[in-house]
Every structure is written in structure tokens, then in C-alpha cells.
Amino acid sequence: MRIKICGITKLDQGQAIAEIGATALGFICVPKSPRYITPENIKNIIQKLPINIDKIGVFVNPKIDLLSEIITNTQLNGIQLHGDESPEFCNQLRHSIPNNIEIIKALRIKSPQDLKKANIYENYIDTLLLDAYHPEKLGGTGKTLDWKIIEEFHPTSPWLLAGGLTPENVTKAIQKFILVSQTQIESNHKFNHNFCGIDLSSGVETAPGDKNLVKVRKLFSSLATLTMKK
């Protein structure tokens, strides 16, 4: 299962979170965000991270040429689109960047109708991410996604669950998508509906961009106690 911690701004925290067990770190490339980090600082952090951890840049309605430049300069190996990017944009982007760069498209879910957008994007992206809808903010709001809405979500693409996840509620959320019993969170779990992992930001923070390592460790302790359905 993928465990992505988003909103990394500090080298020591990024290294510690990777050591604790995260499989992916997210870097916010949106200047207006309180979690914004410059491409230069992203590069400095990435150079000191383990090779096997995914490094994802988060963008909102980016220009493709600027995005491509940031990917090249920072060595990100994935990008997350968290704005109003169209399927046509995603298709153009797919043909403009290397095939080994993962494209994640975030969808902000307010009602079951919003899930229908997933089918439109799946041909052009690698992974979907479901986040809670907020009328003013695009992400990192701490608002919990209504899990009932996505119980019948059956995409063909892998997808990540976000939206107000915390060490306290994460196991309850994940239980809805577990297919096969395992004993350790590090094992290769089997999930239904192509659920592939979780994405947290505010749920493991002291303040925007300042990760709380106590909360991160508590998250992994919670995941380790996960009782898997048969």
C-alpha cells in the first residue's frame, strides 16, 4: 500500500518521514499555498532522499512548459494535478513529459456525481486521488471526505484516498477497501476497487508545512494494527 505524506518543506522532516516508512513524499509547487516550497529547495531535499521513495510535485493549473522545467530541474518522478485541469490537458501533458513520470489527477468530491469525472480522466493519467471538496481551498484543508460516497467507486485506475485522514481515523477508512487478510502493513495487501493507498497532509502537521513526527509515527502505529478483512 502506498503511503504518501504531502506538504514537505524541510529536509530533516522529509528524511525522517521516509525512514519511518512513507512510500511517497509530496512537494507543493503552488506559490499561494502555505506549504509552498521552491523548486531549488525541492531539489536540495530530493538529492538527500532514498532512491526508492516517490517524489511527487503538486501543481494547480500549471503551464506545461514550466511544469516540464521543474520536473527536469528537481528530479521529481511524479506530478499531482490538483486544480481544474481538463482531460485534454492531461492528454497533452502525457505526451509532453517522459513516460516514467507518474501523473496523478486529484478530484475534489462533493457528491456521487463528481465520481463520474474519474472515467473521463483514466485514459490520460496513471493514478487518481480523491480529496474532500472545499469551496475555497484546493487541498490540505483537514476536511474529511464522505467515505460513503465512494463505497461504490469502481475505477479501472489505481487510486489514493485523501481528505482529512489522521492517525485516529485512517484504519477505519482503509478497512472499507481491504480485500484479503494480511498481518503486517508492510505486506502486499490486496484491496478491492483498485484502491492503492492514502495521502495525508494536515493530519500529521503541527502547522501548514511543519510535519509532526510524533503524529507520523502514530500513523504508522495505527496502520500496523490494521485488522484485515478476509
From Swiss-Prot:
InterPro entries: Aldolase_TIM, PRAI_dom, RibuloseP-bd_barrel, TrpF_fam. The keyword Amino-acid biosynthesis applies. It catalyses: N-(5-phospho-beta-D-ribosyl)anthranilate = 1-(2-carboxyphenylamino)-1-deoxy-D-ribulose 5-phosphate. Belongs to the TrpF family. It holds the Pfam family PRAI. This is N-(5'-phosphoribosyl)anthranilate isomerase. GO terms for molecular function: phosphoribosylanthranilate isomerase activity. Keywords: Amino-acid biosynthesis, Aromatic amino acid biosynthesis, Isomerase, Tryptophan biosynthesis. Signal peptide: none annotated. Its EC number is 5.3.1.24. Pathway: Amino-acid biosynthesis; L-tryptophan biosynthesis; L-tryptophan from chorismate: step 3/5. GO terms for biological process: L-tryptophan biosynthetic process. The keyword Isomerase applies.
